[in-house]
Amino acid sequence: KNRQFLEAFDPYDGPLYKYLDAEAQKAGFKLVMTLDTPFRSYAFTSRSGVESLESVRGVKVRVTMSPIEKGFVNTLAMNPCPVGWTEVYTALQQGTVDGEIINFGTFASFNRAEIEDRFLVTRHNMAKVFVVMNKARFDALSPEQQKMIIDAGRKSQMEEWDMSQEFERKGEEYCRQHNIKLIELSDEELAGIRKNLQPLYAEYMKDIDPVFIKLIQEVQK
């Protein structure tokens, strides 16, 4: 994640904002701003025995019902287990699952050091939150009022970006203070994961507008 990524969502000249706003307007909405979430990795209990990328094979990992999330877990040869968020802590305690997808900040907020003691740092997953307004209501406002809303959204978006980075930094600091083992992956290991994910990419990218894909790839350079 870099500053270029944030700038791509700028309401005034960001290419990703312009694309998404145009798509939202087709559905009757005006895109006001986007919000970030930190990148997520995998945390595990000591029971999992995870010490490296190779040792995750067969480990039971909590996932949502997202087919992409399940597909990623399968790519790493782990065992995806759908569990509701409110049940995860108990599932980890009881051994129903031995790991979960989570970011550093949330790990700290929910005091996961009580039950998990290691992180496989993949930073492979993140979510964007979109704040929209009824387009007819927005169009009925004066240009000055419209600008006030977009300006406020832009300011909030930029401040939330910084807050998200700080949330993640403090979460990683929490992990180090609680002696959580951080298993960092080499460039070769990350390249191997990307290669193995190509079939999953191909399966879902065929349903996504290639213009949107190209815009995302541009800001990832």
Where are these regions (language model features)?
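Core domains of carbohydrate- and sulfate-ester-processing enzymes
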Residues: 14-20
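N-terminal secretory/targeting leader peptides
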Residues: 1-6, 22-221
